[in-house]
Amino acid sequence: MTDSSRTTDEAAIRERLDAKVAATRATDARAATSSFAPDVLSFDVVDPLRHSGVDAVKKRAETWFATFRGPIVFELRDLHISVGDGVAFTHSLNHASGDLLAGGKLDMWWRETLCLEKRQGRWVIAHAHDSVPFNPETGKPSLSLKP
């Protein structure tokens, strides 16, 4: 892989992730999942242990978006992209905040690793792994951590 193609691929991946961020802010589940492969496997921070397929990931996004009153503040911080021949991975710290329909406000950070494959000339997310650290003394998630 040449430096030029690596730079081009990294820019294409960054563009797809920027679109995912914009769609999440707009609570548009269809657009937010348009970068996912049809056979994506997602390990989310909430039940169940995995979501298999883009339809399951889209349904999860719709369910999450429906908990907000208005737009979601959403960002990726410390995004790192590593590109190889036909495969790539990213990792970032993700932040979401917004007013909840049930009352109160969500304001949390979590870790995300994405595995991408280049299929038919297009980068798609084949695997997503999101996680929240936990306190080993209490067994509870550490939701108040900030970078």
Tell where the protein language model's regions lie, with residue ranges.
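A beta-strand edge to alpha-helix "cap/lid" segment located at domain peripheries
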Residues: T2-S34, L41-P147
